[in-house]
């Protein structure tokens, strides 16, 4: 798994590449949780380069979303490949999280206004 993060227009874009599984889920959780602890409130998970996500990876998504909700933050998923989207659909996650086709659409999916 490779994780790159960029701050764009008040959003943290976390781009996952490769495979998220039990071998690296803990690292991913720590890195994303640290960003929320530092004050990030709008997080976009760009999954366009993600090849596979296991149940351990899905757990991380849930935990980060919960952490964000506790601080009035939001999580939006974007650019899911068909086979990754299927995993999220089967798990019921598509009914829990906003999903966008692009980063631009993800920005529009946030419910709260950006702080001024």
UniProtKB/Swiss-Prot annotation:
It comes from the Bacteria. It holds the Pfam family STAS. The modification Phosphoserine is found at residue 55. Keywords: Phosphoprotein. Phosphorylated by BtrW. Dephosphorylated by BtrU. Possible positive regulator of sigma-B activity. Non-phosphorylated BtrV binds to BtrW, preventing its association with an unknown partner(s) that might be sigma-B. When phosphorylated, releases BtrW, which is then free to complex with and inactivate its partner. Involved in type III secretion system (T3SS). PANTHER family: ANTI-SIGMA FACTOR ANTAGONIST TM_1081-RELATED, ANTI-SIGMA FACTOR ANTAGONIST TM_1081-RELATED-RELATED. This is Putative anti-sigma factor antagonist BtrV. One of its GO terms (molecular function) is anti-sigma factor antagonist activity. Residues 1-110 form the STAS domain. Interacts with BtrW. InterPro entries: Anti-sigma_ant, STAS_dom, STAS_dom_sf. Gene3D superfamilies: STAS domain. Belongs to the anti-sigma-factor antagonist family. Changing residue 55 to A/D: Absence of BtrW-catalyzed phosphorylation; binds BtrW 2.5-fold more than wild-type. Type III secreted proteins Bsp22 and BopD accumulate intracellularly instead of being secreted in cells expressing the mutagenized BtrV.
